């Protein structure tokens, strides 16, 4: 479980926890269901996390009532996300759209926003996201948790824990942005979620039938928690894009290479220097699908690709690794087929099955304005990661910077941070 769950026992910097439930105002027609795709089912042990921090000037006058009323408006648009999972006779999970609601969590913090943001390791923001996995009683388990944390100065932290089975990270950001608009008093509209037939993925590269970016794990039953033998640790930091590109990547004026691949290549090298791995080495890249026609729908449509190299990564140049990432193979079709074929009765991990890089750099996380003001800081991560680890790269408050959240086995983290220092990713 995530660090934030511990605060329920009064531990950590967030205290005075109160839980309630928020749902849609309009009842869903009896018997309505939402059917997950094979890709959805493959992601069922993963949970997405986001925490947005707003200043006292922005949020001081916002009350619990304001936030809940805006959530009513949001869930009127996407009411199926407030349902609960059940199983068919075959064992296949599906959502009963029974309007059971989302869990709303209130907490207090004795620090000001300025004091909170002064902490160099931003993984402290995990405390702003209340997480609880689905299960062991599926019919009583919310799919989304929303946490409101009031700072001493009047500032506000808004955190979401979002079951990946209902939609990818881009779906989470879309839903949060709608909520932020509703908080401000804007009218919001979300298009109807596509049918299961429209949501099923048709691969442009159907030759990839045996995806290596997904790993089967021991059966977990109805408690959807990734089984790991190793304890994982989080580390989050900001870096300057220019400082990393100039010394490590002689681009020679070529502006076509995305920043994400360059940063991922540098971080991949740092991790490879700590790990002794036989060749070939494979990593997973997860990105937004640029060709997705249903851009504003709650669904899993992210591109999940594998990158394999047959040379020592630790000794490779960043340019070689960027080139390899440009040849990534889209494996969604194979993952979709695996999820469909087992009817959700087998359990898998994608994040951390191989070392995984999640690209969120194309998302303007700071457009989530409340009362006309952007958040002071945004944090993103994933819960339920496999033992190979995850690197998330996303926008910072300053356009010339990026934020990197790293989750690795605890035994590796300090050695990897030493490599980060050698490469100038973090201060010595």
Swiss-Prot record:
Mark the transmembrane ranges.
none
Q: Record's InterPro entries?
A: CAT-like_dom_sf (IPR023213), Plant_Fungal_Acyltransferase (IPR050317)
Q: What is its main location?
A: cytoplasm
Function, as annotated, reads:
Involved in biosynthesis of the epicuticular wax. Plays a role in very-long-chain fatty acid (VLCFA) biosynthesis and is required for C30 fatty acid elongation in leaf. Despite its classification as a BAHD acyltransferase based on sequence homology, CER26 does not seem to share the catalytic mechanism of the members of the BAHD family.
* Tissues expressed in: Highly expressed in leaves.
Bias category Low complexity: which stretches? 21-36
Cellular component (GO) terms are: cytosol
Could you tell me which Gene3D superfamilies the record lists for this protein?
Answer: Chloramphenicol acetyltransferase-like domain
* PANTHER family registered for this protein in UniProt: PROTEIN ECERIFERUM 26, TRICHOTHECENE 3-O-ACETYLTRANSFERASE
Query: Where in this protein does the record put region Disordered?
Result: 1-36
Against Pfam families, the record matches this protein to: Transferase
What biological processes does GO assign it?
A: cell wall organization; very long-chain fatty acid biosynthetic process; wax biosynthetic process
Specify the protein name: Protein ECERIFERUM 26
* Protein family membership: Belongs to the plant acyltransferase family.
Where, per UniProt, does this protein localize?
Cytoplasm, Cytosol
> Among its keywords, does the record have Nuclease?
no
Q: What happens when the gene is disrupted?
A: No visible phenotype under normal growth conditions, but mutant plants have increased levels of C29 alkane and reduced levels of C31 alkane in the rosette leaf wax.
Q: Which UniProt keywords apply?
A: Cell wall biogenesis/degradation, Cytoplasm
């Amino acid at each position: 479980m995530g660090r934030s769950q511990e605060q329920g026992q009064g531990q950590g910097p967030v205290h005075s926890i109160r839980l309630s439930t928020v749902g849609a105002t309009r009842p869903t027609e009896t018997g309505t269901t939402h059917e997950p795709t094979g890709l959805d089912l493959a992601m069922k042990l993963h949970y997405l996390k986001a925490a947005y921090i707003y200043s006292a000037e922005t949020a001081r006058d916002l009350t619990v009532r304001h936030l809940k009323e805006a959530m009513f408006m949001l869930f009127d648009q996407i009411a199926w996300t407030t349902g609960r999972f059940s199983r068919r006779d075959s064992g296949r999970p599906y959502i009963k759209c029974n309007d059971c609601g989302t869990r709303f969590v209130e907490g207090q913090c004795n620090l000001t926003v300025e004091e909170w943001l002064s902490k160099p390791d931003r993984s402290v923001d995990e405390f702003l996201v209340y997480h609880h996995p689905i299960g062991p009683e599926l019919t009583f388990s919310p799919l989304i948790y929303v946490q409101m944390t009031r700072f001493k100065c009047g500032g506000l932290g808004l955190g979401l824990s979002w079951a990946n089975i209902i939609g990818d990270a881009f779906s989470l950001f879309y839903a949060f942005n709608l909520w932020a608009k509703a908080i401000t008093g804007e009218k919001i509209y979300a298009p109807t979620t596509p049918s299961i037939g429209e949501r099923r993925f048709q691969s442009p590269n159907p030759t990839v039938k045996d995806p290596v970016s997904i790993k089967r794990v021991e059966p977990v039953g109805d408690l959807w928690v990734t089984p790991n033998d190793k304890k994982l640790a989080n580390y989050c930091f900001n870096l300057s894009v220019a400082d990393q590109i100039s010394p490590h990547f002689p681009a020679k004026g070529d502006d076509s290479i995305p920043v994400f691949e360059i940063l991922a290549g540098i971080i991949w090298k740092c991790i490879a220097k700590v790990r002794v791995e036989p060749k070939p080495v494979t990593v997973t890249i997860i990105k937004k699908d640029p060709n997705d026609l249903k851009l504003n729908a709650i669904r899993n449509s992210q591109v999940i690709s594998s990158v394999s190299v047959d040379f020592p990564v630790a000794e490779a140049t960043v340019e070689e690794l960027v080139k390899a990432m440009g040849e990534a193979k889209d494996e969604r079709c194979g993952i979709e087929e695996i999820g469909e074929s087992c009817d959700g009765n087998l359990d898998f991990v994608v994040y951390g099955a191989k070392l995984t890089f999640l690209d969120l750099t194309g998302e303007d996380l700071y457009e989530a304005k409340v009362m006309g003001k952007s958040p002071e800081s945004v944090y993103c991560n994933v819960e339920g990661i496999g033992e190979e680890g995850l690197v998330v790269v996303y926008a910072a408050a300053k356009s010339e910077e990026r934020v990197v959240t790293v989750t690795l086995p605890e035994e590796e983290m300090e050695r990897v941070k030493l490599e980060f220092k050698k490469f100038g990713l973090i201060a010595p």
